[in-house]
Amino acid sequence: MTWPNRDQPAFPSSSSGAFSALPQGVSHGGVNLSSFSDFLRHQAPHLLPGAPGPGPTGLPTDAVPHGTTIVALKCPGGVVMAGDRRATQGNMIASRDVQKVYITDDYTVTGIAGTAAIAVEFARLYAVELEHYEKLEGVALTFPGKVNRLATMVRGNLGAALQGFVALPLLAGYDLDDPNPEAAGRIVSFDAAGGWNFEEEGYQSVGSGSIFAKSSMKKLYSQVTDAESALRVAVEALYDAADDDSATGGPDLVRGIFPTAVVIGADGAHEVPEAKISSLCREVVENRSRTETFGPDARPTRGDEL
């Protein structure tokens, strides 16, 4: 990392007592020491996601990769988040194996959609933000505090969003302060201006395929009884989104590329093994590819069978 003034140290020396004399949570020189992004904004703003840099302005938004689609579902005792792997650049497929779901701390996961470069930096910086706060304050942020921190970061990207480079996260986590462990799963969506909303319906999706994914989850959410069934509904929703949205990638059985997913519960956040996702995706594809319901030899369906 390069600081604006190399002749001055980025941090005061410990011998000066500049930091040690400060109580926890107090700002220093107008900078909130417990917020890494706030510190970065004052010391090296060009390193923040979406910060203007050298080069031509007015770059077409389809000239950079975009990622979609993310889904999240609450289940008894936790929450599940999953994302497809495709990134598009205009009408081209820029990548087929993008990672869009990131574990940001022990009980929080972030899914990203929109301008890929900015969205990935959001997820990484947010993970550092949470770790930085815990180290300085000695305690982890509450879940509402995590929401506010991420909302502030999203709001800081408003200038780039107004130019078309929108990056929207989807936050999911387990609220340790909820007295009812079975209902401690949380899903929070954001808009480009930093506004946020706790999802009470139990599911949410962001990205270009979100309208199709949400329609699928709306029909299947009643089947969610645990993390396993929630994971299956998430895969079904991503499959439906890929079926109608060209920017969303479905399970790629030929290349062995499948969605990624994270399950969060009282024991923390855990990535779902690829073998498990692969098996579930193959089962979904097989169930939707039965010869008696698809293809030129399919038996016509009578009206009374609908």
Swiss-Prot record:
Q: Which PROSITE patterns match?
A: PROTEASOME_BETA_2
EC number(s) on file: 3.4.25.1
Q: Name one Pfam family in it.
A: Proteasome
Q: What class of enzyme is it?
A: hydrolase
Q: Does the keyword Phosphoprotein apply?
A: no
An example of a Gene Ontology cellular component annotation for this protein is: cytoplasm
Compartments, record wording = Cytoplasm
Q: Under the GO molecular function aspect, what terms does this record hold?
A: threonine-type endopeptidase activity
Q: Which domain of life is it from?
A: Bacteria
Do you know which CDD domains this protein is assigned to? Answer: proteasome_protease_HslV
Q: Which GO terms describe its biological process?
A: modification-dependent protein catabolic process; proteasomal protein catabolic process
Q: Fetch the SUPFAM superfamilies from UniProt.
A: N-terminal nucleophile aminohydrolases (Ntn hydrolases)
Subunit structure, briefly? The 20S proteasome core is composed of 14 alpha and 14 beta subunits that assemble into four stacked heptameric rings, resulting in a barrel-shaped structure. The two inner rings, each composed of seven catalytic beta subunits, are sandwiched by two outer rings, each composed of seven alpha subunits. The catalytic chamber with the active sites is on the inside of the barrel. Has a gated structure, the ends of the cylinder being occluded by the N-termini of the alpha-subunits. Is capped by the proteasome-associated ATPase, ARC.
Q: Which family does it belong to?
A: Belongs to the peptidase T1B family.
**Know the name of this protein?**
Proteasome subunit beta
Origin organism is: Mycolicibacterium vanbaalenii (strain DSM 7251 / JCM 13017 / BCRC 16820 / KCTC 9966 / NRRL B-24157 / PYR-1) (Mycobacterium vanbaalenii)
